[in-house]
């Protein structure tokens, strides 16, 4: 055991010379069972629509284009497809899920339902939406979109109540009052059905203030009732504001079943699209790469707010996004982050990805996978190391055996050489 302190000292010296195995700022995977959701920065098919035709607009290495592990669409995002007519059917499956999208719905787009609305509320909606997506994709393998069929027995049609620029809200649908309704005080219902998935993410939205019509103010009131279980989900507007009047959305995770959408005032809303969650898996944190513009455009931090441990690891560049194709496409820092998809890594943590599973100078926080056993270098000036004792002891024994073998061999050759000299 006299070798053990020496071995620890040698280990510390090695660590002080640079063998730290530090966490790296990349997204990666432990094996080939992974999937990436993205936008133009990982959309390999977008090359046919751009000039010049080259892959420098992507942050993704083109080697991965034929992997079959990417669902990306230029100009879109999962949130944008979920709520608006500008739709792309994001679909993918994997044990390890990576997200690099969200920039196509930011304060730069300035969406709000009406002139007196508030884009801040839509940024809040975005954060709440991605929180549900990230949490659930840590326990589900498969994500896709499904249409939600509904039946409304009245004659009124759905109306595009919320639109701004090229964005038109169609989820949830808004059904206007019947022609014979004297005002907005009325009860109305519609049936909708969820089937074919393990669970669904659906929107439940209400206006956050008072709606003025014909000198009267109305409060929003929306409910979903599960007719199979008797569970009711509902919201009533309680705010008195009349400016900044916009749509607050909550994102429910619901099982399959028959539902009733109910409104007691203002307008009836009913979901038309849902995130379909399928195939339960062992808990595996998702990885999210910050999705933002160059500083010349306004971005938000909602994906960072939504991505919290233990269900999510967030990766970001420390510098401004500056692309080589154009200012918003082909940034070196984000290309470096996505380069981790080219190889397997044994360990993931809040701090980053560890390339090796032996020792490290950093304790992995919220670890996943086969992670290093080293704990910490407690003093930056004096390399005082704390290691998991088992591998240290085993390595010490191996080192001791090696030293004994070397000593025996040296003695053997010394004795053999002495014998030869004596014989001479």
Curated annotation (Swiss-Prot):
Gene Ontology CC entries for this record: host cell plasma membrane; membrane; viral envelope; virion membrane
Positions annotated as glycosylated: 54, 89, 114, 153, 236, 301, 316, 358, 417
Maturation and modification: N-glycosylated in the host RER.
Main localization of the protein described in the UniProt heading: virion
Bilayer-spanning residue ranges: 393-413
Membrane-side (Intravirion) residue stretches: 414-424
Outcome after substituting residue 158 to A: In strain: Isolate ATCC VR-759 and Isolate clinical OC43-Paris
Compartment annotation: Virion membrane; Host cell membrane
Claim: GTP-binding is one of the keywords in the record: no
Effect of residue 418 to V: In strain: Isolate ATCC VR-759 and Isolate clinical OC43-Paris
Family the entry assigns: Belongs to the influenza type C/coronaviruses hemagglutinin-esterase family.
Protein name as annotated: Hemagglutinin-esterase
Species, as recorded: Human coronavirus OC43
The organism's taxonomic lineage, starting at the top: Viruses, Riboviria, Orthornavirae, Pisuviricota, Pisoniviricetes
